[in-house]
């Protein structure tokens, strides 16, 4: 307490003359007005307000003027420091601004009138405002709106808060203690008249105020003290003229009289120190957060700063204050003065993309020339320099541009993190990208043994929101082509997807509804990748079908991920299933199968001939690609085998000759064929095999490469450009890079096609779709139910729905596998794999609200969790042997949805993005109406549940027990119709009211 001193004061009259509303008593009992003062919690600033709504700030112990701005039309009544600025309360508004004066939010509301005081409630964004008789108003400064109004006895004139409670004093001398939700905990009668000041520190409240007198009011000679933990009064502090009271963090109390007498009371040592400030009449006192500075203002317009620790900061951890950069004056320069470069002229402020910011795909910027080696032995003869050429590097060689400073790039943020960052900055942030200048591969980088990161194995990271929170666009270089989630067979699927003959054949087969399930799944995947328009897709349905084939379960672990074996098995299995329909089998064989004639000749003269179909040809050994291909088409070998004619082992000559080649030729490269794997180059993409091909030339569609120490990638020609596909990473590459020899890249498969330039058929097959699945029950075998004994809950449609028909949809799911997590050494929980959900029920309603599809899906796998509370599915409902529900297979239900999608129907539902992702179906945005997005205000950063919207908008309670997809889809349909019935302005008012009601009940439906 020793050493309190007053540095030089400043006159407030230079800036404003102040007069305010909260009363303070003089020695003779008169009332004057107080000045709102406060210290900044984060920087060395002092804030003051005036009667004209002006707020001013002063920097440091010299009280240097820092900023000045208008907070409102009325007088300033309260100031609260914020970590991102200042919150000022005027009589008619609440103003939230930066320290420099830029407005963040300006809140006006009919409930905000005659405002006198405010303080924090929940965190630094929610404030409670007092001054209106009988009520307190809660305002959110970040959202800029009134969240709720709370009834309160009397009119609050003073407020203070702590971490656990809010304290306010009324005009009749009552002190009210409430929790952070403003629920009244206790009320004390502190004074007979109004309050003069209220101070809260930890669990101690001190107040000073007025008593009634014959001439009006006189100052109360006692400072009242209360313990908030025990909710009882403590011994008061006697001080005859206490107008202001402030508590420091180190158990000291500053008491100030109107005449400027300052008393410091140390509660630990009971020492009292008195000081006298040279003032006219004190109308404001405020202590700094550390307790080593305080400011005093008086009615003459003076502001004094006192300190017992000079040259120290006001706050505990003070941040540097930003000052404007001093303007520099430059001498005028003529535009014709060639001594000054044009780059010396600064750029004005701009918000649009500059023309000079061209992407590297448009123009390839070269590197500046290398500097001349200083070691050259230069000799000058007649002013001409000469040096020997040691031929260490090529002359006049242009180098591709490479940014040496960028060595790596951060992993992508989760989508939820990006939304939080956008909200925190209150502006759009630039989307990150995996691709940079260093990803332009040069001959030097490609010849290095280090694998470039474009070719490395990628990994999906999972947040608490699952895989939907992963930013896949980070890995797609604005190509408009869809990648696939991690799967070892993705390169082959991508290769066939961009082979137009295969694509068209698969889509036509799906449209006709062929019984070949593998081929159907391939076609559905291709259609989904086309509709995705660059968004990532999943091959989970195809792989689930593939894994269900008995032969795949006996594969060795190393063969289970072999892409060549997968290709051979996939095509052979499709061909085997196609044999049930000879016409379809012939078409498939002509498309992908090579007819091979095998002739076995024994030394005894016995001869046998057989015809077979090969869907992949393995290149034989050879020095060139053409030599390898010729040996592949005609193979001969000698061995010994058992002869049934001679009944003994004989020498056998085997001749294999490719009699006819398919339209699409699939070639594989054996592991030992290193020369072909590393050095085959067919730059023009055409090759004419030595077989009966009617002189048609094959064109290279693409090829698959094994990356050393990583997985496989695909190089595919799309139009006239080459693209690299590495799971969900898709980027354009040059033809030179695609065919470049590298020590870490080995070709394993390639696809050639006759008519590779054939147009992709995206729409014409829709005219020949088999839509019978929409009109037939198609229950699974063993499901002993019928319409005579069971209420199916729906009626099948009788005719094909026209385009743009509204279909309300809701889907329910069950868990087949729980998520896999890992607890790290630091205690953090990391999701290794999300839970595996499977479609269990899907319901669709027509525009009138009548169900026409209500499919329960038969599941033969083990179900870990039925999620009954959310799905309404009970154990046994999906078992065909015991279920009393109408069960259909997953392919049947999926086909019904796919048919409605391609018929142009529009789906209405709530949370459809998650439903369609789990179903694994890509639906164009123009065919989706999601009530989650319709009833959403982005600035609120909260999406509303179906149950709450039904209660608040429709006035009905849903999901009271277990969820029911029929009820949920019908509720979503009603919400959409409500949206259609409202005019745009009317709907905005409705939506604001929905959020207002939600904040009052915490967005939960009241139970009563």
Swiss-Prot record:
PROSITE patterns: USP_3
Cofactor(s) in the UniProt record: a divalent metal cation
Entry's Gene Ontology molecular function annotations: metal ion binding; nucleic acid binding; poly(A)-specific ribonuclease activity
Nuclease as UniProt keyword: yes
UniProt-listed GO biological process terms: mRNA processing; nuclear-transcribed mRNA poly(A) tail shortening
The USP domain, residue ranges: 450-755
EC number: 3.1.13.4
Activity regulation annotation text: Positively regulated by the regulatory subunit PAN3.
Function, in words: Catalytic subunit of the poly(A)-nuclease (PAN) deadenylation complex, one of two cytoplasmic mRNA deadenylases involved in mRNA turnover. PAN specifically shortens poly(A) tails of RNA and the activity is stimulated by poly(A)-binding protein PAB1. PAN deadenylation is followed by rapid degradation of the shortened mRNA tails by the CCR4-NOT complex. Deadenylated mRNAs are then degraded by two alternative mechanisms, namely exosome-mediated 3'-5' exonucleolytic degradation, or deadenylation-dependent mRNA decaping and subsequent 5'-3' exonucleolytic degradation by XRN1.
Entry-linked HAMAP family: PAN2
Protein family per UniProt: Belongs to the peptidase C19 family. PAN2 subfamily.
Name of the featured protein: PAN2-PAN3 deadenylation complex catalytic subunit PAN2
Higher taxonomy: Eukaryota, Fungi, Dikarya, Ascomycota, Saccharomycotina
């Amino acid at each position: 307490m020793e050493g309190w001193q007053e540095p030089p004061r400043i006159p407030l009259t230079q800036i404003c003359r102040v007069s305010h509303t909260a009363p303070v008593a003089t020695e003779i009992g008169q009332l004057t007005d107080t000045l709102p003062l406060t210290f900044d919690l984060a920087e060395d600033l002092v804030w003051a307000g005036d009667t004209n709504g002006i707020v001013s700030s002063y920097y440091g112990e010299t009280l240097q003027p820092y900023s000045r701005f208008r907070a409102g039309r009325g007088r300033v009544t309260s100031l609260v420091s914020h970590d991102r600025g200042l919150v000022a309360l005027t009589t008619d508004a609440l103003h939230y601004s930066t320290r420099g004066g830029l407005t963040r939010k300006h809140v006006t509301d009919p409930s905000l009138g005659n405002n006198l005081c405010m303080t924090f409630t929940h965190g630094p964004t929610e404030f409670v405002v007092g001054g209106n008789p009988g009520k307190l108003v809660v305002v959110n400064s970040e959202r800029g709106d009134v969240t709720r109004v709370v009834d309160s006895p009397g009119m609050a004139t003073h407020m203070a808060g702590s971490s656990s409670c809010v304290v306010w004093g009324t005009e009749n001398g009552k002190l009210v203690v409430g929790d952070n939700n403003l629920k009244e905990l206790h009320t004390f009668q502190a004074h007979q008249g109004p309050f003069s000041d209220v101070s809260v520190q930890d669990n101690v409240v001190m107040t000073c105020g007025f008593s009634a007198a014959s001439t009006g009011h006189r100052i109360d000679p006692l400072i009242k003290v209360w313990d908030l933990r025990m909710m009882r009064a403590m011994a008061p502090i006697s001080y005859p003229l206490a107008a202001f009271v402030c508590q420091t963090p180190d158990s000291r109390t500053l008491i100030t009289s109107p005449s400027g007498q300052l008393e410091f009371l140390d509660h630990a040592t009971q020492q009292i120190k008195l000081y006298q400030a040279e003032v006219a009449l004190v109308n404001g006192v405020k202590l700094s957060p550390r307790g080593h500075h305080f400011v005093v203002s008086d009615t003459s317009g003076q502001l004094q700063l006192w300190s017992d620790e000079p040259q120290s900061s006001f706050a505990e951890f003070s941040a540097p204050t930003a000052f404007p950069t001093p303007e520099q004056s430059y001498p005028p320069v003529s535009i014709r003065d060639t001594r000054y470069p044009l780059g010396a002229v600064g750029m004005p402020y701009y918000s649009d993309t500059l023309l000079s910011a061209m992407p590297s795909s448009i123009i390839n910027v070269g590197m500046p020339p290398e500097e001349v080696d200083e070691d050259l032995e230069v000799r000058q003869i007649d002013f001409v320099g000469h040096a020997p050429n040691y031929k260490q590097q090529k002359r006049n060689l242009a180098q591709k541009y490479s940014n040496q400073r960028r060595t790596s790039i951060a992993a992508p943020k989760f989508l939820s993190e990006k939304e939080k960052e956008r909200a925190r900055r209150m502006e759009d942030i630039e989307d990150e990208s995996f691709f940079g200048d260093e990803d332009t591969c040069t001959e030097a980088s490609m010849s290095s043994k280090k694998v470039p990161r474009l070719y490395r194995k990628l990994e999906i990271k999972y947040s608490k929101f699952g895989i939907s929170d992963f930013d896949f666009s980070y890995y797609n270089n604005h190509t408009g082509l869809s990648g696939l989630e991690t799967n070892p067979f993705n390169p082959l699927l991508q290769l066939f997807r961009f082979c137009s003959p295969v694509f068209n054949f698969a889509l036509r087969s799906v449209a006709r509804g062929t019984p070949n399930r593998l081929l159907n799944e391939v076609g559905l995947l291709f259609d989904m990748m086309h509709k995705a328009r660059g968004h990532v897709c999943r091959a989970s349905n195809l792989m689930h079908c593939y894994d269900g084939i008995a032969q795949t379960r006996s594969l060795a672990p190393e063969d289970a991920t072999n892409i060549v074996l997968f290709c051979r098995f996939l095509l052979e299995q499709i061909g085997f299933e196609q044999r049930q329909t000879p016409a379809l089998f012939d078409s498939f064989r002509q498309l992908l199968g090579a007819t091979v004639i095998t002739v076995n000749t024994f030394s005894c003269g016995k001869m046998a001939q057989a015809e077979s179909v090969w869907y992949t040809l393995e290149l034989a050994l050879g020095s060139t690609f053409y030599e390898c291909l010729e040996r592949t088409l005609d193979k001969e070998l000698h061995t010994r085998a058992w002869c049934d004619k001679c009944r003994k082992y004989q020498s056998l000559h085997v001749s294999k000759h490719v009699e006819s080649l398919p339209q699409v030729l699939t070639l594989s490269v054996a592991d030992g064929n290193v020369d072909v794997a590393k050095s085959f180059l067919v730059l023009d993409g055409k090759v004419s095999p030595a077989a009966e091909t009617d002189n048609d030339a094959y064109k290279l569609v693409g090829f698959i490469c094994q990356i050393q120490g990583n997985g496989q990638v695909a190089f595919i020609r799309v139009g006239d450009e080459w693209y690299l596909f590495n799971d969900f990473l898709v980027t354009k590459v040059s033809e030179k890079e695609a065919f470049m020899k590298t020590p870490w890249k080995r070709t394993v498969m390639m696809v050639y096609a006759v008519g590779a330039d054939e147009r992709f058929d995206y729409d014409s097959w829709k005219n020949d779709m088999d839509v019978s699945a929409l009109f037939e029950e198609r229950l699974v075998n063993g499901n002993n139910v019928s319409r005579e004994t069971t209420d199916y809950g729906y009626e099948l449609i009788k005719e094909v729905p026209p385009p743009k028909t509204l279909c309300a949809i809701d889907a329910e799911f069950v868990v087949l596998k729980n998520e896999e997590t890992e607890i790290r050494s630091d205690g953090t929980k990391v999701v290794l794999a999300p839970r595996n959900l499977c479609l269990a029920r899907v319901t669709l309603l027509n525009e009138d609200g009548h169900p026409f599809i209500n499919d329960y899906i038969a599941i033969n796998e083990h179900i870990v969790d039925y999620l009954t509370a959310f799905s309404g599915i009970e154990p046994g409902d999906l078992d065909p042997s015991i279920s009393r529900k109408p069960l259909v297979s997953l392919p049947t239900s999926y086909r019904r949805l796919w048919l409605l999608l391609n018929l142009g129907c529009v789906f209405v539902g709530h949370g459809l993005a998650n439903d369609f992702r789990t179903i694994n179906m890509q639906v164009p945005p123009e065919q989706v109406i999601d009530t989650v997005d319709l009833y959403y205000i982005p600035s609120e950063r909260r999406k509303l549940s179906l149950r709450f919207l039904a209660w608040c908008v429709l006035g009905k309670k849903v999901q009271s027990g277990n969820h029911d997809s029929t009820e949920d889809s019908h509720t979503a349909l009603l919400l959409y119709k409500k949206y259609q019935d409202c005019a745009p302005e009317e709907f905005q008012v409705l939506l604001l009211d929905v959020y207002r009601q939600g904040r009052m009940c915490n967005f939960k439906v009241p139970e009563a």
